[in-house]
Amino acid sequence: HGSDHIIEKPKFGYGKPYNDYGIGFYCTQNPNMAKEWGVGIDHNGYANRYKIECDGLTILDLNAPGYTMLHWLTILLENREFDTSAPLAAEAKEYLMNTFHLDYKSADIIIGYRADDSYFSFASDFINGAISYRQLCNAMRLGKLGQQFVLKSKAAFEQLEFLGYETADSKEWYKKKAFRDQTARRQYFDVERNRRQRGDLYITTILDEEMKPNDPRLR
């Protein structure tokens, strides 16, 4: 877990409600990513290391075959603040939340993409009709941001054991964080955003055809 301080015992119920998956303890299996998340432009950070026993815990893996990128996006729409002032975006949000909603709050742990600033903008472009579903899926892999591992329940917190920490120097790791974000944005505009393909699936088609989660075009 990347932070600006050492966290030996995370507090259940503490955090920002408008994070990707709501209140929870956000972790990664990649220590370098944790260092990037922990630093700021003017302060060092820490990669807090833990281990967790997952037996008996309910894990919602949004990358499992039974889910689509729209399931992930719907959870994001429920928690993050999107600009849905445009009619298409408002209609898209309503349809996705009615059709692709998951009971994610009952899970002990959620595994899925992390929506850093650039990735959040990709999702916003999709619900506004600027990019296709294929482009959204490709864009989420740009910059190799990876997955986040989010503890949601008290039971999950009780299974967490602190192992130690590594210090992250701001001068080194903030530069890497900024470069990753810039790379993702550059690749997005160079490779994805303006490269429409015939047959691409846009949010307008998903709405018009009232597509459901089991539609093979979403796999």
Q: Where would I find each of the regions flagged by the language model?
A:
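ADP-ribose/NAD+-binding catalytic cleft of ART/PARP-like enzymes
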Residues: H1-D20, G40
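Short, flexible loop/turn elements at secondary-structure junctions
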Residues: D4, P31, C54-G56
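Structural beta-strand/beta-sheet cores of well-ordered domains, especially the beta-sheet scaffolds
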Residues: I23, Y46-N48
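Extended catalytic/binding region for NAD+/ADP-ribose chemistry, centered on the ART fold
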Residues: K16-I41
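Conserved NAD+-utilizing ADP-ribose enzyme module
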Residues: I41-G45, C54-R219
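Solvent-exposed, flexible loop/coil residues
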Residues: K11, K16, F25, Q29, ...
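Short His-Asn-centered micro-motif
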Residues: H1-S3, C27-Q29, Y50
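Surface-exposed loop/turn and secondary-structure junction residues enriched for glycine/proline
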Residues: K9-P10, G15, G24, D55, ...
